Swiss-Prot record:
Residues 1-28 are lumenal. The lineage of its organism: Viruses, Riboviria, Orthornavirae, Duplornaviricota, Resentoviricetes. SUPFAM superfamilies: Rotavirus nonstructural proteins. This is Non-structural glycoprotein 4. It holds the Pfam family Rota_NSP4. The keyword Electron transport does not apply.
Length: 175
């Protein structure tokens, strides 16, 4: 770990890269200099970033196989992106996580569709009841016996002794 963080070690790697690049530049027929330089830069960055990270992860992690697998998959995906590919390498764990996420989302969508369908059915039933109540039905004979102002009225024939009880009678008062 000390060697990886040492400034002299980093400078020696940079110096060796510079020497390699200068030897390539001296060849006048080299047309792919920029591509080679960018690949070497990426490789150096991966070297400096991945080795210390991998060592720390292996020391702190209980399952070293998963850490190594994850680091290798990440490096391969980075190289594929740099090469211009849109595809990515995935592990079985990632595929299972994505499948679980998709299944969970599908269940949520089905529950929402079920709730919306139930609400729509209730709304249709309510609209049907409202429509049925608004339809006017033709009536041939109107029954006036249930009208409020017709309940307690008696005709002259129905009064006792044929006399109207509501007519004022003569009252004589003694003085």
């Amino acid at each position: 770990m000390d060697k990886l963080a040492d400034l002299n070690y980093t400078l020696s790697v940079i110096t060796s890269m510079n020497d390699t690049l200068h030897s390539i530049i001296q060849d006048p027929g080299m047309a792919y200099f920029l591509y080679i330089a960018s690949v070497l830069t990426v490789l150096f960055t991966l070297h400096k970033a991945s080795i210390p990270t991998m060592k720390i992860a292996l020391k702190t992690s209980k399952c070293s196989y998963k850490v190594i697998k994850y680091c290798i998959v990440t490096i391969i995906n980075t190289l594929l992106k740099l090469a211009g590919y849109k595809e990515q390498v995935t592990t079985k764990d990632e595929i299972e996580q994505q499948m679980d996420r998709i299944v969970k989302e599908m269940r949520r969508q089905l529950e929402m569709i079920d709730k919306l369908t139930t609400r729509e059915i209730e709304q249709v039933e309510l609209l049907k009841r409202i429509h049925d109540n608004l339809i006017t039905r033709p009536v041939d004979v109107i029954d006036m016996s249930k009208e409020f102002n017709q309940k307690n009225i008696k005709t002259l024939d129905e009064w006792e002794s044929g006399k109207n009880p509501y007519e004022p009678s003569e009252v004589t008062a003694s003085m």
